[in-house]
Amino acid sequence: MENTSGNRKNNPAAKPEKYINIGLLAHVDAGKTTLAEAILYLQGSIRKLGRVDHRDTFLDTDAMERARGITIFSKQARLTLGDWQVTLLDTPGHVDFSAEMERTLQVLDCAVLVISGADGVQSHVETLWRLLRRYEIPTFLFINKMDQPGTDREALMAGLKARLDDGCVDFGEDRSREAWLEELAMCDEELMEQYLEDGGIEAEDISRLTAERKVFPCYFGSALKNEGVDKLLEGIRRYARLPEYPETFGAKVYKIGRDAQGARLTYLKVTGGCLQVKKPLKGKSREGEPWEEKTDQIRLYSGTGFQMVQEARAGMVCAVTGLTKTYSGQGLGAEPASELPVLEPVLTYRLSFPADVDIHRAYRMLRPLEEEIPELHMLWDASANEIRVQVMGEVQIEILQNLIRERFELGVGFDAGSIVYKETIADTVEGVGHFEPLRHYAEVHLLLEPGEPGSGLQFDTICSEDVLDRDWQRL
């Protein structure tokens, strides 16, 4: 790789060297963007608190976001936390834009999962939790809207432990220190032995358990009233760990976008070494074709504004111009490519256009949109002379229609959708798994039978609990 560290003199990106990327995730309407606003205000990054209902928040800047009051596109803001330089990434909470959220997880060092104290753990929260586990992201929880009547802190903590993880621990200052230490010690056998020996737990111990995803610090408050937000930030500063990076250059591309002038932006995190302006970058396209290009600009975005720098060092998230072959999930330099995403659309639609629109020209115009929203999986069906796309739901369809109309001046319709893939068995089938290493023996039979149409999936076991305990029969 030809990107190497150069002269860092007078480069604002070079100091300080402690960088951390924190993501905000939530079920829609949990108050995630309001929390982002409160964090930026407390740390002095903005002078005035905006509100989602007033359509003036710092990060939800797109007209469609402000009109709907939801986050559609992931955004970032820069702030300082002690001697750390923080990039705060606000992700969509609506399930229709969850693929955009998942792309951002690739570059996070830790996450804050925002939960509504009025609603508790909702279904999408469990999906987010599984994703955080898959990407091995240390996670803090902020239980928001505790100013609303009827919120029950103890019941909420019980729900978090039952539906997410028993390692969710209340870090509120009003609880007994002894009870808090005992609960922490229960999360790790090594720590329990240490606690029983000397009766103490150090901050570094908690930091280790948080990094290992054995402890998930929980903070309560109200983002709208700026209550509890300072304690959350103190907890992150005390217990989050800064990653260590190699000297060899590497970068992970997590998003492709375009600025107001239409310039292509490659959003990436430098995962090793240093990325410099005008230095050659090498990679391979999705089709496997090798390429070599130079970066024109390196931008550090905060909201809609940005600062241009000459280099981005390991740990920094930036947007780069001049690259035309990059794609979301691509690894550059020593960084490997990402695994395939978990969240994919379940519906496919045929696009329809007015009679005077050349469909071949429309297809060429829309192809760049797939770079920004790769889950569209845009397909040209030559035999039917039509364009098909995959989407997550009705809200995304409305947003896409607005986006295509505004950017390409094209009216587009989405015909009746169909399931991307659906198949069921037609007859009974039995599979057998046999396992017989030294001193062990097991044989499992799995019987699949077709059910009534629309009956869904049903599971049962006929193995007696006298032979095998129920805990070992969970499907």
Regions found by a protein language model. Give the residues of each.
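Structural and coupling elements of P-loop NTPases
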Residues: M1-L475
